[in-house]
Curated annotation (Swiss-Prot):
It holds the Pfam family CorA. Keywords: Cell inner membrane, Cell membrane, Ion transport, Membrane, Transmembrane, Transmembrane helix, Transport, Zinc. One of its GO terms (molecular function) is magnesium ion transmembrane transporter activity. It is found in: Cell inner membrane. Zinc transporter. Acts as a Zn(2+):proton symporter, which likely mediates zinc ion uptake. The keyword Coiled coil does not apply. It comes from Salmonella typhi. This is Zinc transport protein ZntB. It comes from the Bacteria. The chain crosses the membrane at residues 274-294, 301-321. The keyword Cell membrane applies. One of its GO terms (cellular component) is plasma membrane. InterPro entries: CorA_cytoplasmic_dom, CorA_TM1_TM2, MgTranspt_CorA/ZnTranspt_ZntB, Zn_transp_ZntB.
Length: 327
C-alpha cells in the first residue's frame, strides 16, 4: 500500500489532524509528512464545516460509497468492509449540560492501516480520553490500537450513564416505599433514555463482536481479544438496561396504585364528613324555612339550646361511625 503525503490529508478547518509517532504519542500533521502503516494519520472533521465537506466530497483517498456515510448519512451503529478499508458508525453518550443525554452523538469513521478519518457534528466527549492519552504519550501506537481505545472509551461512558440511570431507579424505588411520587414526566424521561440506549447499544455491541471476529489486517490477535472483552462488557450493560426497563414498568404500576389509593382515601374522608354533617344540615335547613316562624325564636336560650343539640347530634353520628369501624 502506497504512502500518503501530509498535504493530501491536511484540511484547513479540521478539528485536528495528527500523525501517530508509533510510540503512543502524536504530533501535528505537516504537508511534508509521510503517512504509512508505521506512522498512521488521524484526521478528525466536523462534516458541517465547508472545507471539510469539500474534502470529503473530492478526495481520492476515500471510496465513493464512503463519502455520503462520512457526511452524516449513516446513523445506526454498523461496520462495513470497503476494499482495504473499513467503514464504522458508532454512537456515544452526549454528556453536554445544555442537551438531553438521551440524544446520542453519532461518530463515523473510515480507516485502514495508514490513516483514520473520523467525522462528527456534535462533540464526541468520549474521544477526550483518547486524545488525552495521545497527548501524554501513553496512547495507541497503530490504527488497531486506536480503534480498540476509542471503543473502550465509548463503552466506559455508556456504562457510567447506565449506572447513573440505575441509581435514579433505586432512588425512585426507595421514595415509592415512603409513598413519595416522582414529579410528572420524570419516570417517562427515564424510561425513554433506557429505550434509546437499548436501541443503539444493541447494534453497537454487534459491531464490536464483528470487529473482534473479522480478520482485519491492521488488528492483531490482542486487539481482537480486547475488542471481544469490550463487546462482552457492553452486553452486560444491555442486560442491566433490560432489567431497568422492566423495573420502570413495575414502578409505573406502583405509582398508579399509590395515586389511586390516595384518591380513594380522600374520597372516603369527604364521604365521612358528609355523613357527619348531613343530619345537622337537615335540621338547620328545616328550622330555617321560616314558613311558620322559627321554633324557639322568641326564647333567649333557643339558639344556644339548638347549637347544643347540633353538637350532640354530630357527636352521636361520629360515635356511631367509630363503633361501626368506619372511622
Amino acid at each position: 500500500m502506497e504512502a500518503i503525503k501530509g498535504s493530501d490529508v491536511n484540511v484547513p478547518d479540521a478539528v485536528f489532524a495528527w500523525l501517530l509517532d508509533g510510540r503512543g504519542g502524536v504530533k501535528p500533521l505537516e504537508d511534508n509528512d509521510v503517512i504509512d502503516s508505521q506512522h498512521p494519520c488521524w484526521l478528525h472533521l466536523n462534516y458541517t464545516h465547508p472545507d471539510s465537506a469539500r474534502w470529503l466530497a473530492s478526495t481520492p483517498l476515500l471510496p465513493n460509497n464512503v463519502r455520503d456515510a462520512l457526511a452524516g448519512e449513516s446513523s445506526r451503529p454498523r461496520v462495513s468492509r470497503m476494499g482495504e478499508g473499513t467503514l464504522i458508525t458508532l454512537r456515544c453518550i452526549n454528556g453536554s449540560t445544555d442537551e438531553r443525554p438521551d440524544q446520542l452523538v453519532a461518530m463515523r469513521l473510515y480507516m485502514d492501516e495508514r490513516f483514520i478519518v473520523s467525522t462528527r457534528q456534535r462533540k464526541v466527549l468520549a474521544l477526550d480520553d483518547v486524545v488525552s492519552d495521545l497527548q501524554e504519550g501513553t496512547g495507541p501506537v497503530d490504527c488497531g490500537g486506536w480503534l480498540v481505545d476509542v471503543c473502550d472509551a465509548l463503552t466506559d461512558h455508556a456504562s457510567e450513564f447506565i449506572e447513573e440511570l440505575h441509581d435514579k431507579i433505586i432512588d425512585l424505588e426507595d421514595n415509592l416505599l415512603d409513598q413519595q411520587i416522582p414529579p410528572r414526566g420524570f419516570l417517562a424521561l427515564l424510561r425513554k433514555q433506557l429505550i434509546v440506549m437499548r436501541r443503539y447499544m444493541a447494534p453497537q455491541r454487534d459491531v464490536y463482536a464483528r470487529l473482534a471476529s473479522e480478520r482485519l489486517p491492521w488488528m492483531s490477535d490482542d486487539h481482537r481479544r480486547r475488542m471481544q472483552d469490550i463487546a462482552d462488557r457492553l452486553g452486560r450493560g444491555l442486560d442491566e438496561i433490560d432489567a431497568c426497563i422492566a423495573r420502570t414498568g413495575i414502578m409505573a404500576d406502583e405509582i398508579a396504585q399509590v395515586m389511586q389509593e390516595s384518591l380513594a382515601r380522600r374520597t372516603y374522608t369527604m364521604s365521612l364528613m358528609a355523613m357527619v354533617f348531613l343530619p345537622s344540615t337537615f335540621f338547620t335547613g328545616l328550622f330555617g324555612v321560616n314558613l311558620g316562624g322559627i321554633p324557639g325564636g322568641g326564647w333567649r336560650f333557643g339558639f344556644s339550646l339548638f347549637c347544643i343539640l347540633l353538637v350532640v347530634l354530630i357527636g352521636g353520628v361520629t360515635l356511631w361511625l367509630h363503633r361501626s369501624k368506619w372511622l
